[in-house]
Structures are given as structure tokens and as C-alpha cells.
A protein has these predicted regions:
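Short secondary-structure capping micro-motifs at structural edges
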Residues: 16-21, 46-48, 61-66, 83-88
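A broadly used, surface-exposed interaction patch
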Residues: 50-72
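Glycine-rich, aromatic-bearing surface loops/beta-hairpins
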Residues: 92-152
Length: 152
């Protein structure tokens, strides 16, 4: 599988899991999916009492250490529920979003190696009362790597 295909697969897995979680609750604890060179996927989460923001920060730090300790790490996605930044909100004005922080080891030679991918959503209830999530067009913001050490 080529690097782009791996990244898309990880994005799809992360988004699918977040969508399922949000169909059953108003929010969820952040989680990470990690793809290794041998194609194994590891899921991590870090729960800090009832504090979702603190859980995110703790998980972020755990991922930095994890990538350092596991050189076979290929791709990291860190997923959380958040509000979209005003600068990228689309015309519909929807700000509720799933944010996927994507980093790939193969991109570390580039100046901007990481992306936040915001996927806005609307919670919709069907005629029979079943909640579903309607996902809208994603928006991406690029920034320097946080998890992988910079390659030169």
C-alpha cells in the first residue's frame, strides 16, 4: 500500500469511529490510531476524570513519547471533537466538528508535515428517532510536525 492510501485508510477509520461515537453521545474522549510499518493498528486513549480537554493534552504527550519509543510508527491520527476555527467555517455556519490530527513519517522531510482535518457535522434524527451524523465537507490546516522528529 502506498503512503497516500495508508493515510486515507487511517483517516477513514478514525472518522468512522468518531461518527459512531457521536451518534450515541454528545461528545467523546479523544483517541488515537497508530499505524506501524507492518500494517498493525494500535488504538490509544487517555481519560482524565471528566475533563476531555485535559485528556486530549495528556494523550498528545503520550503520543510524542510513543512515537519516540516505537520507530516503526508510520502514521498517527489523533481524533477529538471540537469547534471549527471561525476562519474556516463554511457558509452554512456549522462549527461542530471532528478534528483529525494527521501525521505521517513519510512526510517529515517537508516543511509542513502535519494537518488538522476538520470535518463539520450536523446531528440529524430520522423519522423513527434514530440519531445519525451528517458529515459535511472537510477543511484542512497544515502545520509543522509535533509527533515525529524532523528529518533533514
Amino acid at each position: 500500500m502506498i503512503d497516500d492510501d495508508k493515510a486515507i485508510m487511517m483517516l477513514e477509520k478514525a472518522l468512522e469511529e468518531a461518527q459512531k461515537l457521536l451518534e450515541h453521545t454528545d461528545d467523546f474522549y479523544p483517541f488515537a490510531l497508530i499505524l506501524h510499518h507492518d500494517s498493525t493498528i494500535k488504538r490509544l486513549e487517555q481519560k482524565c476524570d471528566d475533563d476531555i480537554e485535559e485528556s486530549y493534552l495528556m494523550l498528545h504527550d503520550v503520543l510524542i513519547d510513543y512515537v519516540h519509543d516505537h520507530p516503526t510508527t508510520d502514521i498517527v491520527v489523533l481524533v477529538t471533537q471540537t469547534t471549527m476555527p471561525k476562519v474556516i467555517v463554511q457558509e452554512d455556519g456549522i462549527r461542530s466538528s471532528i478534528r483529525i490530527h494527521l501525521e505521517e513519517q513519510s512526510q517529515q522531510t517537508k516543511a509542513i508535515a502535519s494537518r488538522y482535518i476538520y470535518v463539520p457535522y450536523q446531528r440529524v434524527t430520522s423519522d423513527i428517532g434514530t440519531p445519525t451524523l451528517h458529515l459535511l465537507n472537510p477543511q484542512a490546516i497544515s502545520f509543522p510536525s509535533e509527533f515525529f522528529p524532523k528529518k533533514r
